């Protein structure tokens, strides 16, 4: 069986175009995680707060970030896909975040194969309402989990997202190549 984290490339033209492996689905409370040892997607938990993922959420293959996990990516989609789905996407922004004292930033991306997102090239192209909903979700989704503390730290542009992806690719190479 293919290991979606280790066996797939980061993207067809990373960091400009990446692959996003979906774990969690838009509109749902289930927190799935890819378990590379199985390999497969497993239910990690159901979110304790009454919130749902604002869009499909997962990771970028062959990346490793400062939180010692594959680099997180939220892909703006109209309709949810499914856990394990691979979306070819373009990074357009970076959300800075601290999760229990660890840097846990999120790449925001759009699907290459959805013309509804062709006009979104950078942070300034994302509607403010969408950014507010994403920020609200990540700022509050762990509120009812004992001992968990999350702080969103603002937004950065496409270049910052691409730089962070390159950093995560380098960390993967240093730790796993």
UniProtKB/Swiss-Prot annotation:
Please list the cofactors this protein needs. Answer: Mg(2+)
User: Which biotechnological use is given in the entry?
Assistant: Inorganic pyrophosphatases are used in a wide variety of biotechnology applications based on the ability of these enzymes to drive reactions forward and generate an easily assayed product. Since HvPPA displays robust activity under high-salt conditions and in organic solvents, it could be a valuable tool for use in bioindustry.
Instruction: List locations, semicolon-separated.
Output: Cytoplasm
Q: What domain of life is recorded for the organism?
A: Archaea
Which InterPro entries does the entry mention? Pyrophosphatase, Pyrophosphatase_sf
BP-aspect Gene Ontology terms: phosphate-containing compound metabolic process
Q: Which SUPFAM superfamilies match?
A: Inorganic pyrophosphatase
Inhibition and activation profile = Inhibited by sodium fluoride (NaF) in vitro, similarly to other class A type inorganic pyrophosphatases.
Q: Which reaction does it catalyse?
A: diphosphate + H2O = 2 phosphate + H(+)
Q: What is its EC number?
A: 3.6.1.1
Q: How does activity depend on pH?
A: Optimum pH is 8-9.
| Predominant cellular place of this UniProt entry's protein | cytoplasm
Q: Mind listing the UniProt keywords for this protein, alphabetically? A: Cytoplasm, Hydrolase, Magnesium, Metal-binding
What is the relationship between temperature and activity? Optimum temperature is 42 degrees Celsius. Is moderately thermostable, with a half-life of thermal inactivation of 2 hours at 65 degrees Celsius, and retains 82% activity after incubation for 2 hours at 42 degrees Celsius.
Complexes and interactors? Homohexamer. Also forms homotrimers, but the trimeric form is 23% less active than the hexamer. In fact, likely forms a dimer of trimers.
According to its UniProt entry, the function of this protein is described as:
Catalyzes the hydrolysis of inorganic pyrophosphate (PPi) forming two phosphate ions. The hydrolysis of PPi by inorganic pyrophosphatase releases a considerable amount of energy that can drive unfavorable biochemical transformations to completion. Is not active on nucleoside triphosphates (ATP, TTP, GTP, or CTP) or nucleoside diphosphate (ADP).
- Any further remark recorded for this protein: A unique feature of H.volcanii PPA (HvPPA) is its high tolerance to organic solvents, with little if any enzyme inactivation after 2 hours of incubation in buffers supplemented with 50% (vol/vol) dimethyl sulfoxide (DMSO), dimethylformamide (DMF), ethanol, or methanol. The catalytic activity of HvPPA is also found to be robust when assayed in organic solvents. Moreover, HvPPA is fully active over a wide range of salt concentrations.
Family per record: Belongs to the PPase family.
Please identify the protein, giving its name as recorded. Inorganic pyrophosphatase
Lineage per the UniProt record: Archaea, Methanobacteriati, Methanobacteriota, Stenosarchaea group, Halobacteria
């Amino acid at each position: 069986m293919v290991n979606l984290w280790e066996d797939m490339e980061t993207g067809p033209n990373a960091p400009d175009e990446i692959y996003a492996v979906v774990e969690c689905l838009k509109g749902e409370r289930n927190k799935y995680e890819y378990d590379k040892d199985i390999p497969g997607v497993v239910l990690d938990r159901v979110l304790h707060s009454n919130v749902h993922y604002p869009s499909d959420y997962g990771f970028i293959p062959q990346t490793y970030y400062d939180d010692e996990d594959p680099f997180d990516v939220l892909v703006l989609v109209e309709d949810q896909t499914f856990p394990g789905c691979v979306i070819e996407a373009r990074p357009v922004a970076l959300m800075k975040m601290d999760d229990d004292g660890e840097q846990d930033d999120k790449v925001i991306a759009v699907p290459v194969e959805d013309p509804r997102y062709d006009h979104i090239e950078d942070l300034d192209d994302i509607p403010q309402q969408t950014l507010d909903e994403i920020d609200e979700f990540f700022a509050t989704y762990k509120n009812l989990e004992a001992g968990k503390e999350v702080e969103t730290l603002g937004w950065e542009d496409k270049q910052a997202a691409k730089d962070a992806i390159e950093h995560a690719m380098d960390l993967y190479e240093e730790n796993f190549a």
